[in-house]
């Protein structure tokens, strides 16, 4: 039904000479996914040392391992932005309240989430407590998004059509008050990138909106190994002030949707509000056509929920801070020096390799910990490849290699030269396998539905007291009315995730709305979401 939005199945490289061992009954993470998915997610984040809640309600501390993932995502996505002609800049964190008031629908959409600065300093009162002092003449909004403040700069920069297009991206933090925080998925402060562009014509701006959606789709699919469905948001789900919002939607392992990225065609709404005008080729004054688009640290939560298992994190190699960890087994003092020497030699050979345009990241773990403890630490952190090297391996000239996308007790014994030769191939195999596995899961839990009864049954858990994992994505006809959309949201907490983009592989399919009996221009994607 929507196959045209997905890449073809990947080849999964076979592993030879496997030494399969029976998996332990206990798992490293409790509870398991099928027992309590939300708590499982929190435990995976904690066990992998990705992040933790801050003392500031709704905020998080991103720990080095989690930030290493973000750095890789940032570096790779930034290169894709630059390849499409965009440059980076930075704009103020604080936005005058009057700037927001210029665009009424934008203000209304963000009003409940805004943090406001009202005073310029602190002073000690008579009781010896610090209190706000010196009220500001105009309150300042702490950046929830930057269309208005960036628009003020663009209004100064743009005078003529010759100044266009402006193609700028910003890496920044934003603040939106969050009542129900969840690490990476919903936090009051989070990291993101936001692109903001101005164009001479509507056609150019619409092309930019579509192009950046395609950049996001490629990045999430090929770098994060998460398949997505590209589409347009319904009017009620549209970005405040936008004419059109395009999005990519991913399914995670509890069958809920996560909005993985958005690209907005803003028309001339924000250019009129900010005064972005230029002299046209005909000599007349025209308002610019603008776009904005963004992705955030929410993507890290998407990766965790899409790939992690009951033993911890599973990282796609392309964004892993470490690709391969070497675990020397040095239980006997008389062989310790020889084992470490061999491990250091192997690490050097592997570090000389290049993976995905950068040096292969290899960790040689020489900590004075038991081999089992070290092994499980790296399992929980999701390192793609683990290599064990001990005295017996020195004699045989082999090492034990474990892939994180395989059962944790599974090992492949490889001669050292073969490991060096095949390391990149193995990483590519893991990357492709994770994507194919996620795609198969998504497709298995996506259903074409043609009746209201089947729709309600699909999204209703069998056990209301403690709902089991249920539902998924439903492709069903909708008449386009807000009333139907709101009724489904009220009844089932199900929303229209997107109206899938039409292409030659996915022509629109007119039909009848399964809720109202009215005419439908095509099926839309429904689901529960984060």
Give the role of each language-model region.
Residues 1-2, 281:
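Intrinsically disordered, low-complexity segments enriched in small/polar residues
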